[in-house]
Amino acid sequence: MKLSDFDYYLPEELIAQTPAEPRDSSRLMVLNRKEKTIEHRIFRDIVEYLKPGDLLVRNITKVIPARLYGVKETGARVEILLLEKISEGVWEALVKPGSKVKKGTKIILSEGVEVICKDYSQQGARILEFNCSDDKLFELGNAPLPPYIKNQKVPFERYQTVYSKETGSVAAPTAGLHFTEELLERLRNKGLEFADLILHVGLGTFRPVKVEDIREHKMHSERYYVPAETVKKIRETRKNKGRIIAVGTTSVRTLETIARLPNQESYHGKTDIFIYPPFEFKLTDAIITNFHLPKSTLLMLVAAFAGKDFILEAYNTAVKMKYRFFSLGDACFIY
């Protein structure tokens, strides 16, 4: 398949710049893959589409305040975006302007807090060594909001899910942003089960596909962990004929990664799984997700799940009906 097969027209004003308030008041497009039907609801109505015995699989990663600002000894300003922790005090990061940060460059973040560029990494990234603890670093950091969000004053807690626990992502698993504690309680009371996993979202989420033949695209690898309790719940749900419902594409990618590995009690590692049509989903029965960028790997994933033509029809309908798109936008439930 070609990259151009996954394009659609999106007016810029439909890119959400602020989150819905309350979280579960965003709109919800419900897509039935078998019947090819489209319904328009509010996110909290999702309770009506979920059944006792369904398993909701959530990514409990927590976003770090990964965007930092500093100055070189020359006085030139530098922006740093943390990508992944390598060891104590050492991070892989993107720097702007990259041409100004070479091996040995020192950057001052605040009084007594500085960083030295130790080496070059893949695709323009740098290996940086900080002289402070992570806690101090995160005190200085800002929310790493995606570049298409012009409103950089979105409160940091609104870019975290209410169930986030494990620090390590540079972008939110945004499908989870729609859930409130009250909505989760309603789902529990209805007899739904919850299972948690971790995939620390890296910058690959926003990396554009630059090749027309999508099979040539290489995904950035991301670290994941699926605990034994979650593996057990997944197997029990399968045995009892319940549905496995992935909250977000990060949960989908983790589930479909472990589905291709030998049976284990728990799973951890790095995944660079790239899901595009045609693809056999082995563990995912339904997906809760946001509306994704044209020509993005995430759009390809939902196209693989629901069929490319049906997804593009749904997206064109969403544009006509002025749904809000991307990270802070509205949601889709695809089953």
From Swiss-Prot:
One GO term under biological process is: tRNA wobble guanine modification
User: Top enzyme class of this protein?
Assistant: transferase
The catalysed reaction is: 7-aminomethyl-7-carbaguanosine(34) in tRNA + S-adenosyl-L-methionine = epoxyqueuosine(34) in tRNA + adenine + L-methionine + 2 H(+)
Recall the GO molecular function terms of this protein's record: S-adenosylmethionine:tRNA ribosyltransferase-isomerase activity
Does Ion transport appear among the keywords?
no
Which pathway? tRNA modification; tRNA-queuosine biosynthesis
The cellular location(s) given in this protein's UniProt record come to: Cytoplasm
Q: What is its EC number?
A: 2.4.99.17
Keyword annotations of the record: Cytoplasm, Queuosine biosynthesis, S-adenosyl-L-methionine, Transferase
> Which cellular component appears as one GO term in the record?
cytoplasm
Superkingdom classification of source:
Bacteria
Q: Which family does it belong to?
A: Belongs to the QueA family.
**What's this chain's function?**
Transfers and isomerizes the ribose moiety from AdoMet to the 7-aminomethyl group of 7-deazaguanine (preQ1-tRNA) to give epoxyqueuosine (oQ-tRNA).
Q: NCBIfam families from the xrefs?
A: PRK00147.1, queA
Assembly description = Monomer.
Question: What is the name of this protein?
Answer: S-adenosylmethionine:tRNA ribosyltransferase-isomerase
